[in-house]
Amino acid sequence: MTYTPLEREDGTELSVRMKTITKLIYLAFTVVILAIGAVIANGAPGDLFVSINGDGNNGGGFIYEYNPGGVQSTFAAGLSRPRGVAFDHFGNLFVVTNTFDSVSQTLQVTIVKITPGGVQSTFATLSGNLKGQGVAFDGAGNLFVVANDLNDPNLTSTIYKFTPGGVQSTFGSVPGQGFGLAFDRAGNLFVTINHAVDPSELWKFAPDGTSSVFATNPDTVSAWGDLAFDRFGNLFNSTDSATPTADKILKFTPDGEESDFATGFTEPRGLAFNRGGNLFVANRSFEPPGEILKFTPNGVETVFASGIDGPQFLAVQLLPTPRLTR
């Protein structure tokens, strides 16, 4: 009988081949671990990223990164009036920026993509005299951005949709200043809308683009800001009345029941939850400088970071979805 190498009775060839296979498996596993590590190298799970207006000039803005202990570092610089921030499934951070064109006297919106290593590139630009605000990803990895029309006294806004490949389309529009965006688990998109005279509104867009009014602000003075969902499907909304310490964080149940979650803010803006269910709030509070507040699920408040010049929107780096990185 003739034996193939794998069938030798003494097992010698089998042992050699098994060692080779084991090495290959180990190498493949190492490559996967290194790939995941590369994705989160400069954005460890749980780190908080904050867009900073800075001096308000072109290139004067930043993205600050805070580890869970509140230690600050600068993740990106040279950004123009950065606003909404959001992570994709691969750990890339997308930032809405607004650059003033001194020739045309208009504001130009650019969506900047920043890799985990801090490399910046232009993902997309919007044409027109617009101001970009909130940004959010749906479950399929499509990016949504709301931008205000500065040529319209009502600041009517358009919600733009970008595929992962950067193909742009118009998802919907709202009759006022769109600000915060957030998706629920069912794929519905929520957007806050502020009006010059009428009360602020919270609109809900179904995945097919059908819109409805989810809630209306009973306070005609305050404007509604950013949005964030907790793990139970409750929606949180920052408010701004332009009166020091008079602002709130509102909580909406999935059925639309509204309550005050926290009060005593001065111009709160960005909201974000971490995996532990803690809510982070960017409180601009100009004098003294802004701060990031942290609320436990039961509402206990602490100052997470302070002395911040114009904090805007927030995003928490979560563990990337296991996919091929890009």
Walk through the language-model features, giving the residues of each.
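N-terminal secretory signal peptides that target proteins for export/translocation
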Residues: 1-22
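Bacterial N-terminal signal peptides
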Residues: 26-37
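Boundary/junction segments of secreted and surface-exposed precursor proteins
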Residues: 41-52, 321-326
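Beta-rich, blade/repeat-based domains predominating
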Residues: 44-45, 58-60, 78-90, 126-140, ...
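Conserved beta-propeller blade signature
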Residues: 47-51, 92-95, 142-145, 188-191, ...
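Short loop/turn segments immediately following the C-termini of beta-strands
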Residues: 53-55, 98-100, 148-150, 194-196, ...
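A short loop-to-beta-strand structural motif that recurs across blades of beta-propeller domains
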Residues: 61-64, 108-112, 157-160, 200-203, ...
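A short beta-strand motif characteristic of beta-propeller blades
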Residues: 71-77, 119-126, 167-173, 210-217, ...
